[in-house]
Amino acid sequence: QAEAGEFGGGAINLTTASLPDENYLTAGVGISGDSETTAQLGYTYYGSKRDVFGFDDGTRDLPAALRDNGGELVDAGVLENEDTLILQRNNQIPANFSASLAGGYATDIGDTRFGAIASASFSNGWRTRGATQETATAGSLFTSSYGVRTENRVQASGLLALGLDFPQEHKIRLTNVFIRDTSKVARVRGSFESIQTPFEDLEDDRLTGPYDALSYESSYVQRQLITSQAVGEFEFGAVELDLRGSYSKSERDSPYERTTQYRFVGSTGGYAVNLGTPT
């Protein structure tokens, strides 16, 4: 089993059948959910039109005005992808969806047996979780914060295996694997600097406030693995020769993560961007 991940190197040995005993085709569709996420309140944000498939279309690329400014601050008005800064409340988080398709085919070409096995799967799932974090000074509770985190995870994978069996006990196998894992996270965290309201009274409302401070965080992480392996098994009388060659490429991209902090302003009864602690 191989998964897209963050690793520096290593060897991947792909061992799978490539000549099915009989031809087949299977398909499956699944829908699932949980009581804390499905059809409940969560947070998300608009990224790109292809987010549902786990691919960014360039919307999250670092704006040219920021990329070419030598690390200096720029006016927020020149940013072209401000939509990714705005977190939205979704009162009906969708159910999880998955689909799969697999098939195998084998035939004789003269004295040689040829076979192929292919499979593909796709899933789009959601998960909302809440967490409380507290800090204490000299034995007394100093600050307390409650956060809600909604993750939209899209996974896609595919496999294609080809095989040839020759009459002289020679075998050739070619296996290709593609795995992609995308995590889109929206997180809202509210905090009190002086403890007056028990958090047990607020958790069910999922951050309706008012809090002393609010933090909006968005992230988008794409991980991808592509690997191909060719194997040859040859017999020449008492001599056996095994050859193996493989190529793998793993990628991780986390474009343009942002955190925006707000402070509650009592005179206006609303929140203003906190410019004192930029991130």
PLM feature segments, named:
Residues 1-27:
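A beta-strand signature from Gram-negative outer-membrane beta-barrel systems
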Residues 31-35, 122-126, 178-182, 236, ...:
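Transmembrane beta-strands of outer-membrane beta-barrel pores
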